UniProtKB/Swiss-Prot annotation:
It is a multi-pass membrane protein. Keywords: Cell membrane, Disulfide bond, G-protein coupled receptor, Glycoprotein, Membrane, Receptor, Transducer, Transmembrane, Transmembrane helix. GO terms for cellular component: plasma membrane. GO terms for molecular function: trace-amine receptor activity. Gene3D superfamilies: Rhodopsin 7-helix transmembrane proteins. It comes from the Eukaryota. Disulfide bonds join C37-C201, C120-C205. This is Trace amine-associated receptor 7d. Its main location: membrane.
């Protein structure tokens, strides 16, 4: 989605002459082909470390999110509208780990694209679509948590399975409708024809974005982000007020046990806190990348390659974060994972196992 170069001159002849000069001293992606891209490989030590780091992220994204999806879809106790949203979010992150991260790993470490022009475009479409799909899911989840915390007793009648299904459908359709035509129609490259021609070489996969679509991308990121920040600030205020009210009631009545409403409020606040951490992790991962994209689009792609690689892999690693967050905060997820890993979910009636502590 950007130019993979440290300093980009906008003159095509200077690019070609520089590439020819580099080709005489550096390796090529395809040694026996004309117009092969220049390859600058890492030495064996750093190369091995990078493969280990990037590969671990891809495996964690695939396996961790697969655990989340399996847990929610298999165990009946987890069949709720809110959890279906979480499972759909895990599906988007799972697809990032499966269709994007392994191929980006090879490109980042080897400096070449070995998977063909067709999958180069598909890879970029997957990248854009699935990542925006995650963002839209998180936005809807934040709204769901706001409803649950603000009035937990009527929440089940407001956020139903039908509403959850509409949120999931909207998230997937909008991200796919935006991502795929954007890349396949070449709309993102309009006005950059000379740049695209200069960058075209065998073993490359650079799809630059013009200023118009960089701004559209940023707006698609900014609007849900503002919604989430507004909603979670309200959730924080409501949760704090509820906690103060419950504490006052306990002091006044000296009750040893909690009321049903107190328990529901406490549970919903914990869920909101956990998913709030997931949202914060997403925003911290994505914001530096979007800021860099805007800077590059308007200042001529000045970001050094290694800085861009760091930013994009922070984004990719976000797809691996949510299962770790769930594992840390949710005992039911740890128990479900143990049942899946040990194969106990294959037993008869395993879907009815109680995952929640008494």
């Amino acid at each position: 989605m950007r130019v993979d170069d440290d300093r980009f001159p906008w003159d095509q002849d200077s690019i070609l002459s520089r590439d020819l000069l580099s080709a005489s001293s550096l390796q090529l992606c395809y040694e026996n082909l004309n117009r092969s891209c220049v390859r600058s490989p890492y030495s064996p030590g750093p190369r091995l470390i990078l493969y280990a780091v990037f590969g671990f992220g891809a495996v964690l994204a695939v396996c961790g999110n697969l655990m989340v999806m399996t847990s929610i879809l298999h165990f009946r106790q987890l069949h709720s509208p809110a959890n279906f949203l979480v499972a759909s979010l895990a599906c988007a992150d799972f697809l990032v780990g499966l269709t994007v991260m392994p191929f980006s790993m090879v490109r980042s470490v080897e400096g070449c694209w070995y998977f063909g022009d067709t999958y180069c475009k598909l890879h970029t479409c997957f990248d854009v679509s699935f990542c925006y799909c995650s963002l839209f899911h998180l936005c809807f989840i934040s709204v769901d948590r706001y409803i649950a915390v603000s009035d937990p007793l009527i929440y089940p009648t407001r956020f139903t399975a039908s509403v959850s299904g509409k949120c999931i459908t909207f998230s997937w359709l909008l991200s796919i409708i935006y991502g795929f035509p954007l890349i396949y129609t070449g709309a993102s490259e309009a006005g950059l024809e000379d740049l695209v021609s200069a960058l075209t070489c065998v073993g490359g996969c650079q799809i630059p974005m013009n200023q118009k679509f960089v701004l559209i991308n940023f707006l698609l990121f900014l609007v849900p982000t503002l919604v989430m920040m507004t909603v979670y600030s309200k959730i924080f205020l409501i949760a704090r007020q509820q906690a103060q009210n419950i504490e006052k009631m306990r002091k006044q009545t000296a009750r040893a046990s909690e009321s049903y409403k107190d328990r529901v409020c406490k549970r919903e606040r914990k869920a909101a806190k956990t998913l709030g951490i997931a949202v914060a992790a997403f925003l911290l991962s994505w914001l530096p990348y979007f800021i860099d994209s805007i800077i590059d689009a308007f200042l001529g792609f000045i970001t050094p390659t290694y800085v861009y690689e760091i930013l994009i892999w922070i984004v990719y690693y976000n797809s691996s974060m949510n299962p770790l967050i769930y594992a840390f905060f949710y005992p039911w997820f740890r128990k479900a994972t143990k049942l899946i890993v040990t194969g106990k979910i294959l037993r008869e009636n395993s879907s009815t196992i109680n995952l929640f502590p008494e």
